[in-house]
Regions:
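Sec/Tat signal peptide C-region and signal peptidase I cleavage site
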Residues: 25-29
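Bacterial N-terminal signal peptides
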Residues: 13-23
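Bacterial N-terminal signal peptides that target proteins for export
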Residues: 1-13
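Catalytic nucleophile loop
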Residues: 160-161, 184-204
Length: 392
């Protein structure tokens, strides 16, 4: 029989680090657990944060260089202040503890004072008592009591990049999914970058058959590589249930990888068939004159969309931030079809008229996610898989 798991404490070059080791089988051949756990700071510290948060908070980060201010914003929205303590948890399916020092310290010399240097969050100076990373690489790990106990106690959760197919395969239908949705119901701040962003919408591009380029998606909206959430689509088919992103599918690395075409295709796939228009298997209406309409959000690299509720659970606003040294505008795009696609079927190029796009390219404007207003929109059309004008 395997011996009990033990928690070992050690101090090393990056500061106080807790590492959970599962004891070896008596043969010494295998670890008892597949997950990996890393922490900096004191994860056992007692915190003094109210568990009655008033407003939901989310971060959609577009990949590439992480946006320092987005992490600071999450920490503040969690109710963390100097002296309160606070537990910031990173979730991922692959990788290691790379986020721990970045979020906790204010610089490469492990300083814990303000102001933080560029490229560092300064979480300890803001009040965090720990940053913990859990690598959850399979369904057994996602059901593990220790993994879920760490996440349950989190004051903020951030889902790293990687491959969203791993998150869907390993976490959906597990205790970890339930734990995350419980945190969302408690209004604990949750964010994600790249693949982590991809699972925050009600609908997910699951990438179960790999990724797809815009040109391929527009040419065949039913390409086998387009795997969206569950099959068939269902309002409960996504991994997470964040009310801010109802009827929404998200995408990252947006301008850099030219993903407008595939996001328009993903959104079109959500639109239900009716009177000869729409997409087979879709379950949502097109937006004009309808509630709960199909929509999409595309976030550029080195940008983050900060989303906040008003406390009612019904109204959400968003603001885009980026690092001061980021080149270019790093915009966020909000996409919705005003009409159902007139051609959306297997092996046929997509045709959809009156796709409305709104571009948020500054950090001062507030976008209203509840009624899709705040910046002016423009209209593009897709005819036989081709845009009639630049969608950017």
């Amino acid at each position: 029989m395997p011996a009990r798991a033990r928690i070992w404490w050690r101090r090393c070059g990056i500061g106080a680090v807790w590492i959970l080791f599962a004891n070896m089988q008596q043969s010494g051949a295998a670890l008892e657990h597949s997950y990996r756990y890393y922490a900096v700071g004191n994860p056992g510290a007692v915190t003094a944060i109210s568990d009655q948060l008033q407003r939901s908070a989310f971060v959609l980060m577009g990949g590439g260089k992480d946006v320092d201010e987005a992490f600071r914003w999450m920490i503040r929205k969690a109710g963390v202040r100097p002296g309160t303590g606070g537990k910031f948890v990173i979730l991922r399916a692959t990788g290691s503890e790379g986020y721990n020092a970045y979020v906790y310290y204010s610089g490469p010399d492990r300083r814990t004072t303000l102001p933080p240097l560029d490229g560092w969050t300064g979480g300890a100076a803001l009040g965090l008592s720990s940053v913990q990373t859990l690598v959850v690489p399979d369904r057994a790990a996602a059901d593990d009591p220790f993994v879920n106990s760490v996440v349950t106690e989190a004051d903020a959760v951030f889902i790293a990049g990687g491959d969203q197919a791993n998150y869907i395969r390993y976490w959906q239908g597990t205790a970890l999914q339930q734990t995350l949705n419980t945190l969302l119901a408690k209004k604990v701040p949750v964010g994600g970058t790249s693949a982590g962003l991809a699972i925050l919408g009600e609908f997910n591009f699951a990438a179960l058959q790999g990724t797809i380029k815009s040109s391929r998606a527009l040419t065949n909206p039913f390409d086998p590589r387009i795997t969206i959430g569950s099959d068939p689509l269902s309002p409960s088919g996504g991994l997470l249930s964040a009310p801010a992103f109802a009827s929404t599918i998200t995408d990252s690395h947006f301008v850099h990888r030219d993903r407008m075409g595939r996001l328009v295709t993903f959104v079109a796939r959500l639109v239900a068939s009716e009177d000869g228009a729409g997409c087979q298997g879709g379950i949502l209406p097109a937006s004009e004159g309808s509630a709960n309409y199909a929509r999409g959000i595309g976030v550029s690299e080195q940008a983050a969309l900060l989303v906040q509720g008003d406390g009612t659970g019904e109204h959400f606003t968003a603001r885009r931030v980026r690092n001061p040294w980021t080149k270019g505008h790093a915009p966020v795009y909000f996409v919705r079809p005003l009409e159902a696609p007139s051609q959306c079927m297997p092996a046929k190029p997509l045709t959809v008229q009156r796709v409305e796009i709104r571009k948020l390219a500054d950090s001062g404007t507030v976008f209203n996610l509840s009624d899709w207003t705040g910046v002016d929109g423009y209209i593009v059309n897709v005819e036989e898989g081709m845009f009639d004008t630049s969608p950017y």
